[in-house]
Amino acid sequence: MPGVTVKDVNQQEFVRALAAFLKKSGKLKVPEWVDTVKLAKHKELAPYDENWFYTRAASTARHLYLRGGAGVGSMTKIYGGRQRNGVMPSHFSRGSKSVARRVLQALEGLKMVEKDQDGGRKLTPQGQRDLDRIAGQVAAANKKH
């Protein structure tokens, strides 16, 4: 659909569609440790979904589409959560820097993301075009229902 952007579609459906596109393309470089790692220190278990790396990459690409100039540190803030401390009060805890760095490096390998001269990463014109195309597909699929 012409004129449909990432902001116009449901974010969950978009991330699911983009993750499926990344997996189907087969070009995203996935580290070998993805099945054994936790996503943050406040998590108790590794993710149940075996395709979590594609979902995280899709979510990161969507975030960079909405707010460019985000780096590894800001991604750890976005994917942080509540650290439970037993009988002590809970506090905020950041996500894994290694996972955030590897996701951004994988997206750079696809030429969807590039380093920004002001710091952080930003979407390339090709990456923005891919995301808008997938948003159009999601909007067209929703229109049929």
Curated annotation (Swiss-Prot):
GO biological process: antimicrobial humoral immune response mediated by antimicrobial peptide; cytoplasmic translation; defense response to Gram-negative bacterium; erythrocyte differentiation; killing of cells of another organism; maturation of SSU-rRNA; maturation of SSU-rRNA from tricistronic rRNA transcript (SSU-rRNA, 5.8S rRNA, LSU-rRNA); monocyte chemotaxis
Gene3D superfamilies: Winged helix-like DNA-binding domain superfamily/Winged helix DNA-binding domain (1.10.10.10)
GO cellular component: a single term: cytoplasm
Nucleus keyword on record: yes
Modification type N6-acetyllysine: residues: 23, 111, 115
SMART domains according to UniProt: Ribosomal_S19e (SM01413)
Keywords, sorted A to Z: Acetylation, Cytoplasm, Diamond-Blackfan anemia, Disease variant, Host-virus interaction, Methylation, Nucleus, Ribonucleoprotein, Ribosomal protein
Omega-N-methylarginine modifications at: 67
Gene Ontology terms, MF aspect: fibroblast growth factor binding; identical protein binding; protein kinase binding; RNA binding; structural constituent of ribosome
Ribosomal protein recorded as keyword: yes
Effect of residue 18 to P: In DBA1; affects protein stability; does not localize to the nucleolus; affects assembly into a functional ribosomal subunit
Effect the entry attributes to changing residue 56 to Q: In DBA1; affects assembly into a functional ribosomal subunit
Tissue and organ distribution: Higher level expression is seen in the colon carcinoma tissue than normal colon tissue.
InterPro entries listed in its UniProt record: Ribosomal_eS19, Ribosomal_eS19_CS, WH-like_DNA-bd_sf, WH_DNA-bd_sf
Result of changing residue 52 to R: In DBA1; affects assembly into a functional ribosomal subunit
Location of N6-succinyllysine modifications: 143
Compartments in which it is found: Cytoplasm; Nucleus, Nucleolus
PROSITE patterns documented for this protein: RIBOSOMAL_S19E (PS00628)
Self-association state and partner proteins as the record states: Component of the small ribosomal subunit. Part of the small subunit (SSU) processome, composed of more than 70 proteins and the RNA chaperone small nucleolar RNA (snoRNA) U3. Interacts with RPS19BP1; the interaction is direct and mediates the integration of RPS19 in state post-A1. Interacts with RPS19BP1. (Microbial infection) Interacts with Sin nombre virus nucleoprotein (via N-terminus); this interaction probably mediates the loading of the 40S ribosomal subunit on viral capped mRNA during N-mediated translation initiation.
PANTHER family, alphabetized: 40S RIBOSOMAL PROTEIN S19
Record-stated family: Belongs to the eukaryotic ribosomal protein eS19 family.
Free-text function comment from the UniProt entry: Component of the small ribosomal subunit. The ribosome is a large ribonucleoprotein complex responsible for the synthesis of proteins in the cell. Required for pre-rRNA processing and maturation of 40S ribosomal subunits. Part of the small subunit (SSU) processome, first precursor of the small eukaryotic ribosomal subunit.
Disease: Diamond-Blackfan anemia 1: A form of Diamond-Blackfan anemia, a congenital non-regenerative hypoplastic anemia that usually presents early in infancy. Diamond-Blackfan anemia is characterized by a moderate to severe macrocytic anemia, erythroblastopenia, and an increased risk of developing leukemia. 30 to 40% of Diamond-Blackfan anemia patients present with short stature and congenital anomalies, the most frequent being craniofacial (Pierre-Robin syndrome and cleft palate), thumb and urogenital anomalies.
Protein name (Swiss-Prot/TrEMBL): Small ribosomal subunit protein eS19
Originating species: Homo sapiens
Gene coding for it: RPS19
